[in-house]
């Protein structure tokens, strides 16, 4: 009987300890914002805050026209950079000011900035999430693109 009680107490404790923490909502794939960025600091293992980000679109003349900018928040994210009306089919560039970020931490980085150039498709509302993983001498990017939403 004593071992059965101990087993039940242990199981109850495990259930309590494995309960997931509540999700803090700071954006989702269902957001009306068609473009979101997320930046992580691979050295410190946390979101990269206060990184300046510029978004540009290739013009018909072949040059980049900046149309949005911002700084990453406490989660390393920027939401609502643009609207569906502005974010039409075309070639886009997201520029991360990585040099200023590392220099503010007392690190001399190799890269001045990191660019992600991609094509956006207007076949319905899509949500683009551009993620960057940074270190002073390298960076990696990835994208998540939702299916078109009508």
From Swiss-Prot:
Tissue localization of expression: Detected in choroid plexus (at protein level). Detected in choroid plexus.
Quaternary structure (record): Homotetramer. Dimer of dimers. In the homotetramer, subunits assemble around a central channel that can accommodate two ligand molecules. Interacts with RBP4.
Cell membrane recorded as keyword: no
Post-translational modification note: Sulfonation of the reactive cysteine Cys-33 enhances the stability of the native conformation of TTR, avoiding misassembly of the protein leading to amyloid formation.
Name of the protein in question: Transthyretin
Keywords per UniProt: Hormone, Secreted, Signal, Sulfation, Thyroid hormone, Transport
PANTHER family documented for this protein: TRANSTHYRETIN, URICASE AND TRANSTHYRETIN-RELATED
GO cellular component: extracellular space
GO molecular-function terms, A-Z: hormone activity; thyroid hormone binding
Gene Ontology annotations of biological process type: purine nucleobase metabolic process
């Amino acid at each position: 009987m004593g071992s059965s009680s101990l087993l039940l107490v242990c199981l109850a404790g495990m259930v309590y300890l494995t309960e997931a923490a509540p999700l803090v909502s700071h954006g989702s794939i269902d957001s009306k914002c068609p473009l979101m960025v997320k930046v992580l600091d691979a050295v410190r293992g946390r979101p990269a805050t206060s990184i300046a980000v510029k978004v540009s679109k290739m013009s018909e003349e072949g040059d980049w026209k900046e149309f949005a900018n911002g700084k990453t928040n406490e989660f390393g994210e920027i939401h609502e950079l643009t609207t569906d009306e502005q974010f039409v089919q075309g070639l886009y560039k997201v520029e991360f000011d990585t040099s200023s970020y590392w220099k503010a931490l007392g690190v001399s980085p190799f890269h001045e900035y990191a660019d992600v150039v991609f094509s956006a498709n207007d076949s319905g509302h899509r949500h683009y999430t551009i993620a960057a993983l940074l270190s002073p001498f390298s960076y990696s990017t990835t994208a998540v693109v939702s299916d078109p939403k009508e």
